[in-house]
């Protein structure tokens, strides 16, 4: 019973100590918060020479007391933790070995898949090469088409060649008027004259349209005959399909497509050349304008110098003349000119000095801003370090309190009953 009473007294003492420690920690936290607020209010500037991280002696003393109190109760816990850590290490080693084996298997599978894909790509390339080798001979556009295209390119006309005109559908002749319709129409002389004139004009228009259509058909037939002759000469009639219409049309369509592509390419090249010329002309224009501005400035300077030299010449002439010839008006004019020159020189010097002063002020302001930024960064880093130290101490204190409370609970649980 005496031993039990002693243990209970010790536990009560430990409870009291824990309560005191918690109160002290709360006070320390409040003090730290107050210090942070004061630092933020003051916005003081810290330098690396006079900066020293403050050390709380109270925290160290409390930590030492806590460590002394916890050393007695932590022996059992450390032994248990060591056994648990050993088991965990064994489990982690087993898991790592299994993961490495699975990763190796996955890598091997990926390599096999990549090899298969490469083989398939090689086979596809070989098939494409074979197909290209067995492809028919390339078709070229007709000579007339090339000539027309070259003429347009030489003239610089960016117009695509029109397609071949489709065969116009011939209109059916108007149906003959029946006897009833003829009888129903009036027989006045004015209407008869208008009908005859309209019929004559329609007949003339029909004849003109027919002539134009015949000319178009003739040109189409001539081009088709030329292209067919070229196809026959080039050996395109391999299957003996020259008399047929389908293969010949397909050939003609292919040639027209290729010719159109070539014509578009030439158009693009011509446009690109024009753009390059325009850019070069713009560059030369800018250089010429800069030269002109420079020459105008030099011209103005020369004019000013000539004007000043005229004044000096007048002054020299007046000085060389006898005093009887020199008038007071001439002397006053010369003095005014000299004063004007001196004033202009003084103004130029003042402007240069002002510009230099402004540049120096700007440089000083930039340097001051950089220094302020560096000091602010340094202050922020120091504040962050202080906060990190405070949080670290708080975490350590909390961990120690939790361990003490756990140990006390375990002791209370292990006490024998009364």
UniProtKB/Swiss-Prot annotation:
PANTHER family: BASIC-LEUCINE ZIPPER TRANSCRIPTION FACTOR E-RELATED, BASIC-LEUCINE ZIPPER TRANSCRIPTION FACTOR F-RELATED. Belongs to the bZIP family. This is Probable basic-leucine zipper transcription factor E. It is found in: Nucleus. One of its GO terms (cellular component) is nucleus. Probable transcriptional regulator. The gene is bzpE. Residues 248-268 are annotated as: Basic motif. Keywords: Coiled coil, DNA-binding, Nucleus, Transcription, Transcription regulation. Residues 51-75, 95-149, 165-196, 211-252, 336-418 are annotated as: Disordered. Residues 8-47, 324-362 form a coiled coil.
